């Protein structure tokens, strides 16, 4: 199997973007608005970076870095100067994705960042309910999660996912709840298995949250699942506090940088 047979590209995209970077927010702010120092701003789901053109600023045979800088348009909806870099490095059967956020302003920078890669189900038969499995680790018996409720935001209630030998079966109706958001650093690796429980792709990450999502509640025969490392998440229903006080926010002092990464591993390629 080649990389293109595992990672979903634009040809299978249901929305206008595929594998987008989520910045400067992950998910939604309540009513698509937020407050910062007495001003109210509007931001759509997952922020604006995924809709903007990045500049190629570094390139070699197996690596590249793309850069996005704040400008007049971003400052209208997000009043923070920044430089966002996304790096990619191919090493054997591993794709490393690296993020760098730099605060180029003279005041604290508040942000969230996340990934949204999508992966094909292997040997999908749309006429059946079976899709495959997610392996969270054989020692994990239960996981706590939250899911979107009103207007794409969450309620405080937590739910428990019970696993059998660390496995979550993926079926046509698995994502009736929309998204499983696992927080509090419960997971550091997720492996996607085929219907015979053979592993073919893994994600390794250090993010405090990771989400699992597929739009199968709306599109029952969609052929992919998303595994999404997040440094942040959507608002709680009804939140109207300050932007900087949202849950799971990241903060940078002037001149400081935030760096993080995750890896995609093709398990049956050496």
How should each PLM-predicted stretch be described?
Residues 1-14:
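Short, small-residue-biased leader/transition segments that mark boundaries at the very start
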Residues 15-35, 46, 248-249:
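Short acidic, Pro/Gly- and aromatic-enriched capping/linker segments at domain boundaries
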Residues 85-87, 247-252:
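Beta-strand-rich interaction surfaces with strong enrichment in secreted/lumenal proteins
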Residues 70-124:
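Acidic, contiguous internal or C-terminal segments within carbohydrate-active enzymes
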Residues 46-58, 163-247:
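Acidic/His-leaning functional-site neighborhoods
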Residues 108-110, 121, 125-206:
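Active-site/ligand-binding surface loops and adjacent short beta/alpha elements
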Residues 39-92:
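Extended, loop-rich substrate-binding clefts of extracytoplasmic carbohydrate-active enzymes
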Residues 34-38, 99, 250-267:
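Short Pro-Gly-centered flexible turn/kink motifs
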């Amino acid at each position: 199997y080649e990389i293109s047979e595992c990672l979903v590209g634009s040809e299978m995209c249901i929305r206008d973007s595929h594998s987008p970077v989520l910045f400067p927010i992950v998910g939604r702010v309540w009513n698509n608005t937020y407050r910062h120092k007495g001003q109210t701003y509007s931001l759509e789901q997952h922020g604006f970076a995924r809709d903007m053109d990045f500049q190629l600023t570094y390139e070699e045979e197996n690596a590249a870095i793309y850069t996005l800088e704040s400008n007049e348009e971003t400052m209208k909806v997000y009043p923070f100067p920044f430089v966002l870099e996304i790096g990619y490095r191919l090493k054997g059967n591993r794709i490393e994705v690296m993020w760098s956020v730099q605060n180029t302003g003279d005041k604290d920078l508040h942000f969230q960042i996340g990934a949204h890669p999508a992966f094909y189900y292997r040997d999908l038969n749309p006429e059946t309910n079976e899709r495959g499995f997610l392996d969270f680790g054989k020692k994990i018996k239960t996981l706590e999660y939250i899911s979107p409720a009103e207007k794409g935001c969450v309620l405080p209630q937590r739910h428990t996912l019970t696993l059998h030998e660390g496995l979550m079966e993926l079926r046509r109706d698995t994502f009736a709840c929309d998204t499983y958001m696992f927080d509090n650093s419960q997971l550091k690796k997720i492996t996607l298995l085929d219907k015979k429980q053979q592993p073919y792709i893994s994600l390794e990450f250090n993010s405090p949250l990771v989400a699992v999502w597929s739009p199968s509640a709306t599109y029952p025969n969609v052929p992919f699942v998303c595994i999404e490392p997040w440094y942040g998440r959507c608002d709680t229903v009804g939140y109207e506090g300050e932007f900087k006080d949202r849950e799971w926010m990241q903060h940078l002092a002037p001149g400081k940088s935030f760096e993080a990464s995750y890896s995609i591993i093709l398990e049956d390629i050496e």
